[in-house]
């Protein structure tokens, strides 16, 4: 099967991620004002509970099944066999997880039971998800367009129908059901690439067992966030969960933008690994340096615009977002870097046990720190706990990659920090004279980009370094 070009894949994924990025920028202000911190907290708390079940139901989707498919793209018979075996394995697992979820919420949940019930639709969406097939065959057009339509549906419902806390159920139902509906086009186009074959039950079992190794990698981004939100909900209040969730939603938008390139590169890097190409190490190093050039200014930019941004975006009830973001902003650099090293090196070369060990230890550290620090410092304790955990993991990752002689371009990184700090100073001065409006924020972003790019060109920053 002929794969789409890397350029085309990046365009389609970039378009989808742009829409995915823009949608929350429109919906979050509406939801924050309609539901308030406590309403946002209820939605976030229930979603983070279902996230633990989704981690199991979606095991292997992004990081394993697409690689299995990528190895079979040139043989239609083998490709078809792999697809149906993976799909059946996923389907049985997800339906079992859904049954477990229903039992848990029936026994333990009294308040807001309907909200928790509707969140369970996400697990049905995970059961039907076949995006891994299109990722493995490097055909991102169909899933990207389908996801764009789904984002449009969510946006329309929020803008037209969400008015106050009585619309909580409608909102949760809408965002959950689109995860099911946006799979329909993927199934319709599937017949172009594969045919129906009998399921090999032995292979289904083998796939299931192998995919379990990717349980923690699959939930890397969500695991620690879920821990923070759940502990906040149990130890603190739904209002604190709402404020923390909204702040982290902004970070997630930035992280999603950075990870677009990462996800598109996985099938290509897998092929490099199979061919034992020496370009794997060089590609990893280049991608890390490019990522830092993008994320360093994002960190300083977020801190600079937040004092005026939160007022028009979240509302005055979310004032705690400003000091919270000052702590959390550095995660825009740390989390994508952690994920890049994990996806483009550790998982590609099958260092799954090492990766799982680091994530498990990180989860324990994060949980212990959350329980201790949230009790004393509330949402700021959750932020500090997450920051410490991610920093420990990053040090661990750097120790791993030094063994294959992957090095950062230190000079370039220092120049980026200098440029970003100068940009931060300029934005701080300009922000002092601007009103807290959307247009002022857009102007600040534009000024920040121009200042940063001019400083980069002045210092003649070398993106790739010497390898």
Model features per residue range: what roles?
Residues 4-62, 98, 155, 175, ...:
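Signature of the first transmembrane helix
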Residues 29, 57-74, 251-295, 341-348:
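Helix-loop junctions and terminal segments of transmembrane helices
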Residues 123-147, 330-361:
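Membrane-interface junctions at transmembrane-helix termini in multi-pass inner-membrane proteins
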Residues 362, 411-466:
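Transmembrane alpha-helical segments of multi-pass transport proteins
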Residues 120, 144-192, 360-365, 379-400, ...:
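Hydrophobic alpha-helical transmembrane segments
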Residues 105-121, 303-337:
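Interfacial segments at transmembrane-helix termini and the short loops linking adjacent helices
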């Amino acid at each position: 099967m002929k794969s789409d070009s890397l350029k085309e894949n990046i365009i389609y994924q970039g378009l989808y991620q742009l829409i995915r990025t823009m949608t929350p920028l429109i919906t979050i202000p509406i939801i924050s004002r309609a539901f308030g911190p406590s309403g946002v907290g209820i939605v976030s708390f229930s979603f983070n509970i279902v996230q633990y079940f989704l981690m199991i139901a979606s095991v292997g989707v992004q990081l394993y099944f697409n690689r299995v498919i990528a190895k079979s793209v040139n043989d239609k018979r083998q490709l078809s066999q792999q697809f149906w075996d993976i799909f059946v394995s996923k389907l049985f697992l997800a339906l079992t997880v859904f049954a477990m979820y229903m039992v848990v919420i029936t026994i333990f949940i009294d308040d807001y039971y309907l909200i928790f019930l509707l969140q369970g639709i996400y697990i049905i969406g995970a059961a039907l998800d076949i995006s891994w097939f299109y990722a493995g065959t490097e055909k991102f057009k169909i899933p990207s367009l389908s996801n764009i339509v789904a984002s449009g549906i969510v946006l329309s419902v929020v803008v037209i129908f969400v008015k106050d806390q009585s619309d909580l159920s409608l909102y949760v139902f809408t965002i959950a059901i689109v995860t099911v509906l946006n799979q329909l086009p993927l199934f319709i186009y599937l017949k172009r690439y594969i045919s129906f074959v009998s399921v090999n039950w032995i292979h289904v079992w083998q796939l299931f067992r192998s995919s379990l190794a990717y349980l923690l990698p699959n939930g890397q981004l969500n695991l620690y966030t879920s821990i923070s939100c759940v502990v906040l909900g149990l130890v603190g209040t739904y209002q604190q969960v709402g404020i923390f969730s909204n702040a982290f939603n902004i970070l997630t938008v930035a992280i999603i933008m950075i990870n677009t390139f990462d996800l598109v590169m996985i099938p290509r890097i897998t092929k490099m690994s199979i061919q034992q190409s020496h370009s794997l190490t060089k590609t990893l190093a280049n991608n890390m340096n490019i990522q830092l050039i993008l994320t360093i200014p994002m960190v300083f930019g977020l801190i600079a615009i937040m004092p005026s941004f939160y007022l028009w975006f979240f509302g005055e009830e979310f004032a705690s977002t400003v000091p919270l973001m000052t702590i959390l902003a550095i995660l825009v650099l740390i989390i994508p870097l952690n994920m890049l090293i994990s996806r483009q090196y550790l998982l590609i070369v099958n260092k799954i046990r090492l990766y799982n060990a680091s994530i498990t230890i990180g989860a324990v550290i994060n949980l212990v720190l959350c329980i201790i620090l949230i009790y004393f410092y509330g949402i700021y304790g959750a932020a500090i706990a997450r920051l410490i955990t991610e920093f420990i993991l990053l040090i661990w990752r750097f120790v791993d990659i030094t063994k294959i002689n992957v090095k950062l371009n230190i000079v370039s990184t220092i120049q980026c920090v200098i440029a970003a700090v100068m940009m931060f100073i300029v934005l701080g001065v300009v922000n002092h004279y601007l009103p807290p409006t959307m247009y002022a924020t857009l102007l600040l972003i534009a000024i920040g980009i121009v200042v940063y790019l001019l400083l980069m060109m002045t210092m003649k920053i070398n993106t790739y370094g010497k390898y």
